[in-house]
Amino acid sequence: MQFEVSKTILLKALSDVNGAVEKKNTIPVLQNIKIEAKNNQVFLFATDMDILITSHFECQISTEGSTTVLAQTFFDIIRKIPDGIISINLENENLLQIKLGKSRYKVSCIDPAEFPIISSEELTDEIELDAQTLAKMISKTQFAISNDETRYYLNGLFLHSLQENNNYYLHTVATDGHRMALSSLFTGIAKEFGIIVPKKTVSEIKRIIENTKKVSLAVSRVKIKIVCDKTTIISKLIDGEFPPYDKVLPKNNFNIVNIKRKDLFDCLDRISILANDKHRSVKIKLFENKFCLQVGDDVNPLAYEELDVVYNDNKIESGFNSKYLLDIIAQIEKEEVVIKFNDGFSPALIESSDSNSLFVIMPVRI
């Protein structure tokens, strides 16, 4: 195998696939990237057996062939080597040479026949989406993915294509049982499916698509395939049933307050310094045009903040995890946050006045 390619092109392809590599894997070949040169194209493959990322580029190939090299070593060499045209040459089955000008590097190889490939033959239900929109939907929900492995079905992002009011939408949903994030997109595409995408795959999808324009998505009962420009992600799904998230959405939260997002975030950020109990609890009091936050008891609080708001509904006193609140408010881009309460003991609904995303947060006892 021998080919020449510019550093820029090779580094971009390597950067795309490198995230799939499991650097501490006990199977040596899974720490490697597979390189395959044929038909004037070079294909790169990386996998941890759950996710496979491939990328390809066109270049001048002198000799077709394939091999696998240690991913991080190869990536670091290409990243640090000067700009220019790089020559890649498989000298023998066990040694790959990298040349650019007067620079020479040789790295050991593993037989490509040992490299596993995840099949995508059974994937159907393909839809095309705006990549920037999907990346934003992921950003607004992935923070709520659970790390609790005992409830493995919450360890991923629920991707739900469904019909609502004679229209078709795509929802991204995540919850850890303490908070839930939901983002919605009108697609108009008559496809219905519900899949749980693993957390690592979600991060890789977002990383790869966020600087592109269009993305193609195909799913089956057990896999998802994302195609974006010259990069393809194939991943296994979480085998489980995501809880009926629509039943979590509060229906009777009629005590509504609008707050400046930056003011609320800054107050929470300050007051959370002293919210150091198990739940990082902050008490919220809402009454007579006042939105108050405090840590500690009512008589002698450790920290207290007060914001002026327009509010004349029922008095509300509730407690929330300050970190969870900050995580949610950080996802809101508009100037105002809308918080809807039922009472002090029920979940609160948080949204932006003109957003397609909403958030639910459970109260904590104070």
Model-based region annotation:
Residues 1-366:
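Structural preference for solvent-exposed beta-strand-turn elements
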